[in-house]
Design a protein with these regions (language model features):
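A structural alpha-helix within SAM-dependent methyltransferase catalytic domains
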Residues: 25-28, 49, 93-97, 166, ...
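A short acidic, Gly/Pro-enriched loop at the edge of an enzyme's catalytic core
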Residues: 68-77
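Conserved alpha-helix/loop element of class I SAM-dependent methyltransferases that forms part
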Residues: 1-11, 26
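A short glycine-rich, Lys/Arg-flanked "PGG" loop and its adjoining helix->strand segment in the class I
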Residues: 90-105
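Class I SAM-dependent methyltransferase SAM/SAH-binding core
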Residues: 14-16, 20-66
Length: 195
């Protein structure tokens, strides 16, 4: 995500799904003039206020679906691994577009569609010893809600194909400058061999 960001000096930034505010503080330390971080979790924002407090950061308890409540404009809207939890992606993208200053940027990361697509059957194909060989893909071409486990069972996230994502952005008025797919480092593969 950070490799896609412009020079932050003097920028106003909105962080969607800011969590505990770590990125917000990094943005300020990188020269941002003002950062607004929004998150649906009051508990995460309480941690953000304690651990990542700064006079240039404002934290708001607001779901991404309610961006139209924000009246100011930003140079940059950022979201790290949160957009796949929003049901109405089209509305979100239009709201973000409307919150940007002229020549503003929207930089986001989300769970890869090959991960979000899975909805039935066995997630992994394993060898006779139970070792994971590869992830199974199912229902990639069908956008919609999926349930997963992320600390708890039944977490809802929304799968979208690459074409759905790209076309939604273009229809809202965005020009796509760059797309990067994540590739795990050797260190990450050793640390998390089951993923």
């Amino acid at each position: 995500l950070f490799s896609l960001l412009p020079d932050l000096q003097g920028k106003t930034i909105l962080d969607l799904g800011c969590g505990v505010g770590g990125h917000c503080l990094e943005f300020v330390n990188g020269g941002a003039k003002k950062v607004v971080g929004i998150d649906i979790s009051k508990k995460m924002l309480e941690v953000a206020e304690k651990e990542n407090h700064h006079s240039k950061i404002t934290y708001l308890n607001l779901p991404m679906e309610s961006l139209s409540q924000i009246s100011e404009k930003f140079d940059l809207v950022v979201s790290s691994l949160a957009i796949h939890y929003v049901k109405d992606f089209e509305k979100l993208v239009c709201d973000v577009f409307n919150l940007l200053n002229e020549n503003g940027l929207f930089v986001f990361s989300q769970e890869h569609p090959l991960n979000t697509c899975f909805s039935e059957g066995e997630r992994w194909t394993k060898d006779e010893k139970g070792n994971k060989l590869f992830a199974n893909i199912s229902n990639y071409s069908t956008d919609g809600v999926r349930e997963s486990v992320w600390f708890i069972d039944g977490v809802k996230k929304y799968h979208r194909t690459f074409s759905s994502i790209i076309n939604t952005l273009v229809l809202a008025g965005f020009s796509i400058e760059k797309l990067i797919e994540p590739i795990p480092t050797e260190e990450l593969l050793l640390e998390f061999p089951d993923h």
